[in-house]
Amino acid sequence: MPFYRRSAGSPAGHPLSRLLVLSGPSGVGKDTILREVRERHPGLYVSVSATTRPPRPGEVDGRDYRFLSAAEFEEWIATDDLLEWACYVGNYYGTPKTPVLERLAVGEPVVLEIDVQGALQVKNNFPAAMLVFIRPPSLEVLAERLRSRGTDAPEAIERRLARAREELALADRFDHQVVNDKLAAAVEAVERLLFEEIPDEPAGG
């Protein structure tokens, strides 16, 4: 069952009401939650973001990210081929526009997993999109998760935590917030938001 969410000024059943944006601080568990949801719903379309950062071990181009050169990414910016984009720690990140709009045009739900500023860009451009903020139980728990990944130097972790504080201050601008304390509960919460159907309002309502 597809999800439908109504935003101010967006009619029920509007194609863009099928656009869900999942966001939250780095290390909060967005990837894990989304992977679990996709295992339960293999046909769910999740947009593949583009980036200029180098691939991490095990990442595959076209599956985890579209890995581009800076020149290629800047060409996409110039030709308006991105729904949103940002530069973080010297690397570009963004969402290719065409695949998302093609899916929405034929009535398929689409999920974006992007950073907080990108999510707010999408909401500004597409008010019918539903924003879901994944938050940690505490900053202390988030710090431990970042350290346990073993992919960042201590200085980089501190930068990520500083950014997390800024992003948490924006959480109230999202339509929904989910605390990733127990993974199973967080997955179920996101799944309910994805596949909950909201009926049309009565005429004149």
UniProtKB/Swiss-Prot annotation:
Pfam families linked: Guanylate_kin (PF00625)
Which Gene3D superfamilies does this entry report, sorted A to Z?
Answer: Guanylate Kinase phosphate binding domain (3.30.63.10), P-loop containing nucleotide triphosphate hydrolases (3.40.50.300)
Its EC number is: 2.7.4.8
Major subcellular location class = cytoplasm
Where on this chain does ATP bind? G24, P25, S26, G27, V28, G29, K30, D31
Keyword Ribosomal protein annotated: no
**One GO CC term of this entry?**
cytosol
Q: Which InterPro entries match?
A: GK/Ca_channel_bsu (IPR008145), Guanylate_kin-like_dom (IPR008144), Guanylate_kinase (IPR017665), Guanylate_kinase_CS (IPR020590), P-loop_NTPase (IPR027417)
Q: Which UniProt keywords apply?
A: ATP-binding, Cytoplasm, Kinase, Nucleotide-binding, Transferase
| Highest taxon of the lineage | Bacteria
Chemical reaction(s) catalysed? GMP + ATP = GDP + ADP
Enzyme kind, highest EC tier: transferase
Domain Guanylate kinase-like as annotated: residue spans: 17-195
Where found? Cytoplasm
Q: GO: which molecular function terms? A: ATP binding; guanylate kinase activity
Q: Which family does it belong to?
A: Belongs to the guanylate kinase family.
What does the record give as the function of this protein?
Answer: Essential for recycling GMP and indirectly, cGMP.
Protein name per its UniProtKB record: Guanylate kinase
Species this protein is from = Gloeobacter violaceus (strain ATCC 29082 / PCC 7421)
